Amino acid sequence: MIIEIEGIKLKLHPEVYEPAEDSILLLKNLVDVKNKDVLEIGVGTGLISIACAKKGAKKIVGVDINPYAVKLAKENAKLNNVNISFFESDLFENVTGKFDVILFNPPYLPTSEDEKIDSYLNFAFDGGKDGREILDRFIYELPNYLKKGGVVQILQSSLTGEKETINKLKPLGFKVEISARLKVPFEELMVINAWRL
């Protein structure tokens, strides 16, 4: 089955996170990526990376821990006639170089051991016990991969505390703002923009 979001055609896969309100909020609030080197962590279907290609990004690297997502994102890039380098990586593990823009829609649901699902989809939701496990690892490693003057965009849920994210970014030398908000049942979604000073 092929769906279309904002003019981007996407094949779906049962083991890959299907774009939802969080993906769309990030998509509609992307920073200017024209002529920029872009890295997306956790590409899923490839929607955001493909949008960056259509908006004129110079180079795009997209990674995901889920091999089904990497394969699907490659197929979707082909479907939309764009050139993107997709490969498997646990966050920055297999990434080299520095980027102007880094994008991340992390798994943010607080998940106990008995709530985990036996599927690659678990990677898309499971944020650890407090929902911050993956996000905090990402923030800690982020300065090694973002150029000075570069920007990171993080999709944040009120479930995992935007203040905590902001308070972790600032001491690392980031100027932080919330650029978009969306109330959905049980939570508020936000896009956090943080510039490396």
UniProtKB/Swiss-Prot annotation:
GO terms for biological process: methylation. S-adenosyl-L-methionine binds at residues 42-46, 64, 105. One of its GO terms (cellular component) is eRF1 methyltransferase complex. It comes from Methanocaldococcus jannaschii (strain ATCC 43067 / DSM 2661 / JAL-1 / JCM 10045 / NBRC 100440) (Methanococcus jannaschii). Putative protein methyltransferase using S-adenosyl-L-methionine as the methyl donor. May methylate a Gln residue in target proteins. NCBIfam families: hemK_rel_arch (TIGR00537), PRK14968.1-3 (NF011529). GO terms for molecular function: nucleic acid binding; protein methyltransferase activity; S-adenosylmethionine-dependent methyltransferase activity. PROSITE patterns: N6_MTASE. InterPro entries: DNA_methylase_N6_adenine_CS, Euk-Arch_PrmC-MTase, PrmC-related, SAM-dependent_MTases_sf, Small_mtfrase_dom. Its EC number is 2.1.1.-. It holds the Pfam family MTS. Substrate binds at residues 105-108. Belongs to the eukaryotic/archaeal PrmC-related family. Keywords: Methyltransferase, S-adenosyl-L-methionine, Transferase. CDD domains: AdoMet_MTases. This is Putative protein N5-glutamine methyltransferase MJ0928. It catalyses: L-glutaminyl-[protein] + S-adenosyl-L-methionine = N(5)-methyl-L-glutaminyl-[protein] + S-adenosyl-L-homocysteine + H(+).
